[in-house]
């Protein structure tokens, strides 16, 4: 046994000395003496050595392409010249096969072994796999040999949904090129178009890829023409592939090497690195994902964050392959991660620039904006005792999500909760589902609203996302609401229903153009408040799922908006108040009062349910009283006895109505909130 251990130790020593004397500079290898010398690490090293020794003499068969591509962690850490680095992302609409293509690239380059492979490898959250979407940005470093030259390919995975366009902008800022993946059976979609324009603004080299060519309905020639007409890209050399079947993957890898330019060689300049993502690790603090734009960063360097003006020591740096592999040094053009015992994510904001503390860069990296929440709603725990748990859960989610904003809110009906800001409706759904799934919370959500600007008589401008905080009519001159420009791509058969939908939502028609003979692009300007309900569901329903949409924020416009209050037995119920357009006030008020009449339990007295604008009642329903038969004990006799009993009952009901309070049950609140989401 001792002899066996000695021979293994000698083998490890020989391997380590081989790497130490190699002329090519290496990052950390599994045998590096700089790695942790814990017993577990030694065992792993010995096990790796045994496997290497046992398999070295047995593989005499000709290796396949995947065998040739399969590389160990230490090979992926090999230093390559900056001219052999390629940073790229994948632009695609939802369900056009982006995550499947990313999986195949990881598999073909040997970055992920076949036994570790699972569908949507870069989509770490169960929620991402279930919904088939990418939410959080991921990155992976791949090693690819082309014409006997090793290349380092950094893939930065991006989400495709309109709500997560801020994630896309992070990715594009860290890349030189992009794969434009379009479903060969569906063609160009609206969100793809928006991301392509973002990529063109960033001067990225775009490679068109027509995916799903194995489907019976695939029309690569038609889709190529569509891309040329809509986007203006030359598709004569577009790559035809099927990520699912593995067709055309080698051509894509070769095109990345040949067509995407390498990063600029600026290693001699002062360090500037762009933070494009971060997440919180309970043991190591905030882990920062970054792209080195200028200069070099080494392990142990004292670094400085230019926006937050905080400094730290880089305890650990490395690359994402896609799991973290430690490195000694990262150069200009490379993508990696950093751990520096950062306790607060506010010290390492997304979009911030990392530089050296002793040799600061003159200017931070330009053109980066912080994500702004567009949709707000209240989140309240069903169990009031869970309020601290909800706060902790939101704080943890905020560490990973730069766009999530929240502040405490109190409601007479629902107790303590938070007013939360989101990028859009999908973002709101994802956060709610993660709170319920990952933190075991049961939540009540209020109807989503947007941020209104209120111009007051004294000249102040107040931003208001909560109807209960809206200044009184006598104190304000006007209310402005956010407007968006919406572009819908649809087959020509559904133009009528979609135009009707947009006009019903106070949309202002701008233009319509035919992209191809059968597909049209319709542009409208409409209030964001009209979109935060069921607009997207209606768009899909009226077009039988064929239409897609993309929107961008335009600015604020003055509108005739009013606050609609709900009164129950003469008392206003603030959580049910909402801000609506004057023309829709009656319809919304009528729907809310009718719903409340169905849901509030009957009382011993008559209960009026009213929808009001200020002091004016615009819709009303009455909840009739429960009848108590006070005459049941009277058997004939004098009528005055009956009259006396009825008069006494009427007086009692009158007194009860004056002092009685009507409790609105939780179910009624939830049903009305659901109704508000539908009718607004």
Swiss-Prot record:
One of its GO terms (biological process) is positive regulation of translation. It catalyses: GTP + H2O = GDP + phosphate + H(+). It is an enzyme of class 3 (hydrolase). One of its GO terms (cellular component) is chloroplast. GTP binds at residues 92-99, 157-161, 211-214. Keywords: Chloroplast, GTP-binding, Hydrolase, Nucleotide-binding, Plastid, Protein biosynthesis, Transit peptide. GO terms for molecular function: GTP binding; GTPase activity. CDD domains: EF4_II (cd03699), EF4_III (cd16260), LepA (cd01890), lepA_C (cd03709). Belongs to the TRAFAC class translation factor GTPase superfamily. Classic translation factor GTPase family. LepA subfamily. Promotes chloroplast protein synthesis. May act as a fidelity factor of the translation reaction, by catalyzing a one-codon backward translocation of tRNAs on improperly translocated ribosomes. This is Translation factor GUF1 homolog, chloroplastic. It comes from Vitis vinifera (Grape).
């Amino acid at each position: 046994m001792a002899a066996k251990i000695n021979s293994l130790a000698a083998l490890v020593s020989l391997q380590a000395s081989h790497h130490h004397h190699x002329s090519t500079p290496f990052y950390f290898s599994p045998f590096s003496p700089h790695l942790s010398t814990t017993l577990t690490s030694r065992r792993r090293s010995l096990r790796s050595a045994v496997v290497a020794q046992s398999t070295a003499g047995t593989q005499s068969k000709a290796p396949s392409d995947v065998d040739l591509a399969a590389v160990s962690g230490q090979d992926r850490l090999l230093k390559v010249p900056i001219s052999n680095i390629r940073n790229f992302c994948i632009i695609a609409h939802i369900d056009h096969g982006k995550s499947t293509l990313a999986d195949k690239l990881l598999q073909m380059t040997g970055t992920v072994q076949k036994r570790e492979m699972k569908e949507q490898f870069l989509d770490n959250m169960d929620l991402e796999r279930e919904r088939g979407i990418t939410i959080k940005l991921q990155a992976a470093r791949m090693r690819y040999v082309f014409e006997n030259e090793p290349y380092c390919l950094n893939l930065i995975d991006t989400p495709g949904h309109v709500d997560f366009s801020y994630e896309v902008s992070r990715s594009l800022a860290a890349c030189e090129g992009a794969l434009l993946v379009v479903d060969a059976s569906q063609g160009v979609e609206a969100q793809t178009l928006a991301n392509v324009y973002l990529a063109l603004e960033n001067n990225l080299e775009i490679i068109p890829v027509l995916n799903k060519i194995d489907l019976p309905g695939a029309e690569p020639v038609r889709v190529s023409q569509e891309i040329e007409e809509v986007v203006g890209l030359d598709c004569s050399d577009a790559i035809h592939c099927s990520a699912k079947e593995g067709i055309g993957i080698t051509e894509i890898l070769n095109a990345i090497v040949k067509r995407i330019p390498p990063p600029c060689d600026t290693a001699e300049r002062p360090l500037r690195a762009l933070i494009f993502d971060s997440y919180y690790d309970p043991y190591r603090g905030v882990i920062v994902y970054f792209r080195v734009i200028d200069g070099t960063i080494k392990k142990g360097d004292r670094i400085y964050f230019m926006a937050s003006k905080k400094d730290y020591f880089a305890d650990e740096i490395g690359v994402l392959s896609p799991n973290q592999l430690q490195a000694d040094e990262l150069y200009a053009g490379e993508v990696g991660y950093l751990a520096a015992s950062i306790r607060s994510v506010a010290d390492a904001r997304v979009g911030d620039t990392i530089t050296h503390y002793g040799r600061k860069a003159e200017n931070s990296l330009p053109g980066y904006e912080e994500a702004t929440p567009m949709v707000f709603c209240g989140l309240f725990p069903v169990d009031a005792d869970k309020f601290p748990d909800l706060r902790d859960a939101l704080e943890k989610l905020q560490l990973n999500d730069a766009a999530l904003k929240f502040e405490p809110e109190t409601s007479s009906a629902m107790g303590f909760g938070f007013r939360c800001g989101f990028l859009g409706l999908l973002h709101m759904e994802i956060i709610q589902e993660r709170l319920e799934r990952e933190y075991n919370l049961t939540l009540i959500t209020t109807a989503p609203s947007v941020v209104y600007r209120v111009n007051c008589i004294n000249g102040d401008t107040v931003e208001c996302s909560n109807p209960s905080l809206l200044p009184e009519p006598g104190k304000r001159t006007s209310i402005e609401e956010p407007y968006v420009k919406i572009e819908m791509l649809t087959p020509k058969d559904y133009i009528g229903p979609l135009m009707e939908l947009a006009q019903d939502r106070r949309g202002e028609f701008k233009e319509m153009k035919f992209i191809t003979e059968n597909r049209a692009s319709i542009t409208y300007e409409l209030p964001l408040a009209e979109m935060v309900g069921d607009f997207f569901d209606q768009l899909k329903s009226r077009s039988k799922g064929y239409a897609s949409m993309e929107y961008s924020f335009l600015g604020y416009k003055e509108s005739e908006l009013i606050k609609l209050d709900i009164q129950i037995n003469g008392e206003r119920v603030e959580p049910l108040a909402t801000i609506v357009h004057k023309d829709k006030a009656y319809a919304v008020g009528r729907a809310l009062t009718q719903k409340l009449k169905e849901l509030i339990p009957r009382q011993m007295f008559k209960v009026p349910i009213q929808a009001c604008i200020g002091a004016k009642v615009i819709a009303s329903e009455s909840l009739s009283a429960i009848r108590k038969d006070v005459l049941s004990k009277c058997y004939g006799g004098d009528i005055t006895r009956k009259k006396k009993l009825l008069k006494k009952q009427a007086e009692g009901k009158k007194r009860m109505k004056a002092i009685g309070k009507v409790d609105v049950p939780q179910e009624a609140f939830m049903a009305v909130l659901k109704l508000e989401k539908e009718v607004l």
